[in-house]
């Protein structure tokens, strides 16, 4: 069945070949962003300089100073419970107000984005036509989804499979900015290098929170530590 789906993909969509390749390992993740709408490198997406800002009822920051340009990749670290995810969601909401910017969001809790009552194919499908569904099936097969996993409810998937589904969603959407909360946490040690490579090669801007030092070092150009006083640039 997989061979039939792959042959159909070749007929229907050459672009699909740019995005995924057949995995060599069971948990391999070989995805690629392509046909990307680049933002100017010097364009400011974010330029905050705010005193005594209340991010949430439990999070007040004395001085929030942060800028992000069109192709910049910034990581945020900090102690557990210091408010990294809350800050990231605040920045996501702020950036979402921009009408000329496309954003891909990967929260820690995938169910915020995934529609659990849909199948993976239905979730990724825009038109619902046969050729599109065959291309999507091929992408999912390349990510080691079984036929049942492709067609049953997303709620039945493991955390790792949900993570792969959300990665594929980001790749197919190809947004100009990615906001990623602990992007590597649900992936196996053998697939994490491929996830890091995907985001390192991503041609847009990234705002990310993570405890994964290897990921931060490989992907990010700047890293900030968050505490109640604000953000301080650090080396890790």
Language-model features: locations:
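ABC ATP-binding cassette signature C-motif
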Residues: 39-236
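Coupling and communication elements adjacent to P-loop NTPase active sites across diverse families
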Residues: 1-56, 69
């Amino acid at each position: 069945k997989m061979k039939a789906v792959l042959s159909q993909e070749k007929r229907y969509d050459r672009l699909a070949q740019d995005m995924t390749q057949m995995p060599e390992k069971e948990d391999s993740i070989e995805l690629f962003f392509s046909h990307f709408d680049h933002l100017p490198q010097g364009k400011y997406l974010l330029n905050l300089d705010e005193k005594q800002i209340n991010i949430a009822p439990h999070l007040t920051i004395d001085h929030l100073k942060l800028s992000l340009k069109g192709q910049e990749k910034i990581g945020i670290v900090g102690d557990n419970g210091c408010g990294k995810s809350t800050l990231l969601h605040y920045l996501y909401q702020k950036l979402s107000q921009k009408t000329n910017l496309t954003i891909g969001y990967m929260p820690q809790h995938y169910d915020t984005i995934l529609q659990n009552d849909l199948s993976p194919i239905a979730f990724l499908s825009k038109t619902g036509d046969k050729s599109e569904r065959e291309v999507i099936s091929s992408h999912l097969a390349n990510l080691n989804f079984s036929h049942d996993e492709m067609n049953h409810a997303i709620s039945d998937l493991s955390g790792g499979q949900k993570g792969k589904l959300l990665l594929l969603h980001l790749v197919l959407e190809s947004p100009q900015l990615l906001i990623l909360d602990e992007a590597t946490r649900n992936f196996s040690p053998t697939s994490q290098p491929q996830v890091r490579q995907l985001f390192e090669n991503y041609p847009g801007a990234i705002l990310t929170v993570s405890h994964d030092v290897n990921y931060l070092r490989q992907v990010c150009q700047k890293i900030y530590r968050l505490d109640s006083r604000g953000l301080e640039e650090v080396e890790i």
